[in-house]
C-alpha cells in the first residue's frame, strides 16, 4: 500500500505527492490521519511528477503539508445489502445514527459502470402507487424516472414519504433515500416520520447535508445509488429517492471551480451533461430487477430553461408538477393534472380505457379553467345547460383528485387510503359519464374510491 505526503491544501482541494511508480488511479480513495479523525480524499486528477489532485470528503481544517497519506488502492466503498435498511449513513457508508456498526456482509465501490445494453429490460409495466392523481394522469413506469417539481411547502417531501410508505407496505419493496445537500432539520424530520409510519426497516437513508464540503455532496447520490443497485441485482424492485437533484449539480459546479476548470453557461461546470448522465444511466432496470427513481427538482428562479433542470428533463419519463394554486384550494396532493406528464400515458401501454379517461379528465378541467373567467364576470346563471354540467363535473373531479395520505393522518385527522388503479379509472369514468351527477361535490373531497364518496353523500 503506497504512502504519499500532502504538498498543498486549498480549501477542499488537497494535492498529494506519491513515488513515481505508485501513483494512485483517478477515483481511488486516499486516507489521511487528521488529528484523531481519519479523512478520506478522492483522486480527481493526476498532475504529473507523482502529484495527484484530490477532493476531501470531509472538513480539511487542520490538514498541513507533509502529513502522510495512504493509498487505499480502491474507490470509496460502502456497505450494501439488508444490513443498511433502517440506518442513516454518510457518503462513506459510516453510520451516523448512533446505533453501532452496520455489520454488512458486502461492500461495493460507488463508481460503477452502467448496465450494458444487453442487460437492460424493456418492460412497459406500470408501478401502481395507490395515489389516484398520479396513477391516472402521470403513471409511473416500473424502472422509470420521475421528477417531482415544486416550490417550498407544496408537498414534495410528503408525496415522497407517501410513495415510500405505499411501496413498502403494498408491494413489500425496499427504498433508498439519498438526501443530497439537504437541510439537516429536514433529514431529521424525515427519519422520525419514517419511524412513526413503521416503514423505517424498509428504507436505507444516506445523507450529505448542506454544511458538508462539495466533494461529499457530489458523491452522496452515488452512495445511495450503489445501495439501490445491490437490491436491484438481488432481483428486487427498488425505489430510489433523491432530494434534491439540483444540489447534486450545484456540488459538481463547486468541485469543478475548485479544480480550476473553465465554467460554461450560467457558471455551471463544462461537464454538466456528462455528470448528470453518469448518475442517470445507472438508475435503470435490468432483466433481474428494477430501480424506479423519484427525484425532487428545485427550479432556480422558476426558470425551466436553466441548464440544471433542463439537463434533468432530458432523462425523465414522468414529471409530477406540484402547484401552489391547487394547494391553496386545500386539495392535497397538490398535483397539477394539466401540467404533469408521463411517457407511459399511451393507449399501447396503459390501455385505451385508462388513456381515454385521463384525457377526458384533462379536457373537462381545461374547459372549466376557460369557463372560470365567464363565471367570475357574469355568474353561473349565464352559462348554457351544457356548460353548467361541465362545471359541476369538473368541480367533482377536482375534489376527487384529492386523497387522504397515510403519512399525513396526524394533520388531516382522516385515515389514509390506497386506491387501486382499477377503482381510480372506474371512479373518474363514472363522474365524466354523469353517473354521480346527483351527488353533492363535498362528497368527493378527501375520499379514497368512488364507493366511499357514495357512502359519504348519504351522511351529508
Curated annotation (Swiss-Prot):
PANTHER family linked to this entry: ATP SYNTHASE, ATP SYNTHASE SUBUNIT BETA, MITOCHONDRIAL
Name used for this protein in its record: ATP synthase subunit beta
UniProt topology in membrane: Peripheral membrane protein
Quaternary data: F-type ATPases have 2 components, CF(1) - the catalytic core - and CF(0) - the membrane proton channel. CF(1) has five subunits: alpha(3), beta(3), gamma(1), delta(1), epsilon(1). CF(0) has three main subunits: a(1), b(2) and c(9-12). The alpha and beta chains form an alternating ring which encloses part of the gamma chain. CF(1) is attached to CF(0) by a central stalk formed by the gamma and epsilon chains, while a peripheral stalk is formed by the delta and b chains.
NCBIfam families reported for this sequence: atpD
Coiled coil: none
Gene3D superfamilies: 2.40.10.170, Bovine Mitochondrial F1-atpase, Atp Synthase Beta Chain, Chain D, domain 3, P-loop containing nucleotide triphosphate hydrolases
Localization: Cell inner membrane
Catalytic activity: ATP + H2O + 4 H(+)(in) = ADP + phosphate + 5 H(+)(out)
GO CC, alphabetical: plasma membrane; proton-transporting ATP synthase complex
UniProt-recorded Gene Ontology molecular function terms: ATP binding; ATP hydrolysis activity; proton-transporting ATP synthase activity, rotational mechanism
Residues bound to ATP: 150-157
Amino acid at each position: 500500500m503506497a504512502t504519499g505526503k500532502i504538498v498543498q491544501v486549498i480549501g477542499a482541494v488537497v494535492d498529494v505527492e506519491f513515488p513515481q511508480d505508485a501513483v494512485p488511479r483517478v477515483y481511488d480513495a486516499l486516507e489521511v490521519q487528521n488529528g484523531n479523525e481519519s479523512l478520506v480524499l478522492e483522486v480527481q486528477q493526476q498532475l504529473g511528477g507523482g502529484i495527484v489532485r484530490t477532493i476531501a470528503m470531509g472538513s480539511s481544517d487542520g490538514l498541513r503539508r507533509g502529513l502522510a497519506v495512504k493509498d487505499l488502492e480502491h474507490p470509496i466503498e460502502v456497505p450494501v445489502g439488508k444490513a443498511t435498511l433502517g440506518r442513516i449513513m454518510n457518503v462513506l457508508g459510516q453510520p451516523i445514527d448512533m446505533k453501532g456498526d452496520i455489520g454488512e456482509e458486502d461492500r461495493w465501490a460507488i463508481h460503477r459502470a452502467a448496465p450494458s445494453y444487453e442487460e437492460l429490460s424493456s418492460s412497459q409495466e406500470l408501478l401502481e402507487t395507490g395515489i389516484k392523481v398520479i396513477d391516472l394522469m402521470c403513471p409511473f413506469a416500473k424502472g422509470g424516472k420521475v421528477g417531482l417539481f415544486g416550490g417550498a411547502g407544496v408537498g414534495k417531501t410528503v408525496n415522497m414519504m407517501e410513495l415510500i410508505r405505499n411501496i413498502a407496505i403494498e408491494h413489500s419493496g425496499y427504498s433508498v433515500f439519498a438526501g443530497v445537500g439537504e437541510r439537516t432539520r429536514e433529514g431529521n424530520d424525515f427519519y422520525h416520520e419514517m419511524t412513526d409510519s413503521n416503514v423505517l426497516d424498509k428504507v436505507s437513508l444516506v445523507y450529505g447535508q448542506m454544511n458538508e464540503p462539495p466533494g461529499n455532496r457530489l458523491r452522496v447520490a452515488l452512495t445511495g445509488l450503489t445501495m439501490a443497485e445491490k437490491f436491484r441485482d438481488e432481483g428486487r424492485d427498488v425505489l430510489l429517492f433523491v432530494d434534491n437533484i439540483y444540489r447534486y449539480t450545484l456540488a459538481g459546479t463547486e468541485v469543478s471551480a475548485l479544480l480550476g476548470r473553465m465554467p460554461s453557461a450560467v457558471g455551471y461546470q463544462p461537464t454538466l451533461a456528462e455528470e448528470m448522465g453518469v448518475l442517470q444511466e445507472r438508475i435503470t432496470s435490468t432483466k433481474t430487477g428494477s430501480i424506479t427513481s423519484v427525484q425532487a427538482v428545485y427550479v432556480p428562479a422558476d426558470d425551466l430553461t436553466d441548464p440544471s433542470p433542463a439537463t434533468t428533463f432530458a432523462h425523465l419519463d414522468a414529471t409530477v408538477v406540484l402547484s401552489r394554486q391547487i394547494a391553496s384550494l386545500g386539495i392535497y396532493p397538490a398535483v397539477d393534472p394539466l401540467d404533469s406528464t408521463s411517457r407511459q400515458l399511451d393507449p399501447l401501454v396503459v390501455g385505451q380505457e385508462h388513456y381515454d379517461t385521463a384525457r377526458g379528465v384533462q379536457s373537462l378541467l381545461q374547459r372549466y379553467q376557460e369557463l372560470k373567467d365567464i363565471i367570475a364576470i357574469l355568474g353561473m346563471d349565464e352559462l348554457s345547460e351544457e356548460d353548467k354540467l361541465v362545471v359541476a363535473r369538473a368541480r367533482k373531479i377536482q375534489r376527487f383528485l384529492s386523497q387522504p395520505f397515510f403519512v399525513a393522518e396526524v394533520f388531516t385527522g382522516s385515515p389514509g387510503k390506497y386506491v387501486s388503479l382499477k377503482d381510480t379509472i372506474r371512479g373518474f369514468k363514472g363522474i365524466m359519464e354523469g353517473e354521480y351527477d346527483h351527488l353533492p361535490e363535498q362528497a368527493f373531497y378527501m375520499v379514497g374510491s368512488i364507493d366511499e364518496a357514495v357512502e359519504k353523500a348519504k351522511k351529508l
